[in-house]
């Protein structure tokens, strides 16, 4: 059983809606030790599809792409509910829901699309045992850091980031919910050699969405027409999703996400980090990156 430490000291907290709990040293939003045991004991089915990401790496974007693929490009079906209510997060309970997402998963029939921010070593064993297909999306760490900072500012259930300088230090040391970005992307990169994992990059999807969506279709063994493919590309573009209340989270109460502080969907363009990092921070980040990623074959683009 993973080692659990509740309310680990990661960051100052706003009025609390989520507890921060360390699981094997990884800060998570797990409700309790008892709830973590339920997550660990989750029984996946072979046709369950898992979407795994580090926070702020394109989860909502990929969720919409997968939902449209699974619904053959039917736009109205994909507007049946807002993103958080269409498919569940394995380990989370959101403030606007009466019960944890896992309970919704257990009530629904397969096949299911299930989301998670867990690192690979904390994934319930049944997902590996049942050989579930997993789509993993990785985003370059500089843009991920900036996006995560703004998310902390606008989401009341996240710890107060204080300022960018302090958040930068905590992100670099892995003292944020989700843990170390470096460990997360490397862990899933290694796992892909042993399991059915399609490992995608945020920047690649942004640069050539058609090519990357075709990879997903092949992975899922799904055939669609060129017309439907183009429809999916259009409706999952940043500009369209930003205006779609079923994907931009504006239907949530401002007490949960305050878009007047920062919109959930801000820019979505690789390279925004350059508007925030100082020269010194960038140099420090690059040095730390080289150290932590030494020996890995993973490469990231910080702009396109």
From Swiss-Prot:
The active site is at 117 (proton acceptor). It catalyses: an alcohol + 3'-phosphoadenylyl sulfate = an alkyl sulfate + adenosine 3',5'-bisphosphate + H(+); a phenol + 3'-phosphoadenylyl sulfate = an aryl sulfate + adenosine 3',5'-bisphosphate + H(+); lithocholate + 3'-phosphoadenylyl sulfate = lithocholate sulfate + adenosine 3',5'-bisphosphate + H(+). It is an enzyme of class 2 (transferase). Its EC number is 2.8.2.1, 2.8.2.2. One of its GO terms (molecular function) is alcohol sulfotransferase activity. GO terms for cellular component: cytoplasm. InterPro entries: P-loop_NTPase, Sulfotransferase_dom. The keyword Cytoplasm applies. SULT1C3 gene appears to be present only in humans and other primates. This is Sulfotransferase 1C3. It comes from Homo sapiens (Human). The gene is SULT1C3.
């Amino acid at each position: 059983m993973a080692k659990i430490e509740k309310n680990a000291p990661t960051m100052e907290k706003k009025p609390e809606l989520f507890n921060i709990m360390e699981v094997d040293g990884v800060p998570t939003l797990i409700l309790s030790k008892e709830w973590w045991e339920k997550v660990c004991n989750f029984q996946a089915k072979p046709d369950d599809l898992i979407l795994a990401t580090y926070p702020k790496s394109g989860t909502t974007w990929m969720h919409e792409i997968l939902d449209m693929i699974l619904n053959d490009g039917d736009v109205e079906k994909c507007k049946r509910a807002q993103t958080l209510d269409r498919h569940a997060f394995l380990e989370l309970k959101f403030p606007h829901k009466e019960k944890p997402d896992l309970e919704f998963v257990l009530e629904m029939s397969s096949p299911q699309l299930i989301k998670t921010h867990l690192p690979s070593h904390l994934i319930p064993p049944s997902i590996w045992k049942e050989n579930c297909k997993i789509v993993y999306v990785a985003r370059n760490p500089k843009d991920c850091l900036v996006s995560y900072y703004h998310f902390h500012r606008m989401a009341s259930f996240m710890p107060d980031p204080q300022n960018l300088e302090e958040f930068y230090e905590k992100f670099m040391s892995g003292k944020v919910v989700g843990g170390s970005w470096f460990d997360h992307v490397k862990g899933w990169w290694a796992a892909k050699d042993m399991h059915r994992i399609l490992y995608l990059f945020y920047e690649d999807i942004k640069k050539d969405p058609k090519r990357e969506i075709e990879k997903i279709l092949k992975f899922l063994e799904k055939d669609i027409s060129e017309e439907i493919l183009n429809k999916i590309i259009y409706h999952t573009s940043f500009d369209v999703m930003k205006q779609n209340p079923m994907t931009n989270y504006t239907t949530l109460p401002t007490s949960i996400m305050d878009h007047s502080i920062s919109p959930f969907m801000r820019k979505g363009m690789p390279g925004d980090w350059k508007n925030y990092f100082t020269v010194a921070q960038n140099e420090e980040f690059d040095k730390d990156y080289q150290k932590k990623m030494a020996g890995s074959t993973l490469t990231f683009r910080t702009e396109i």
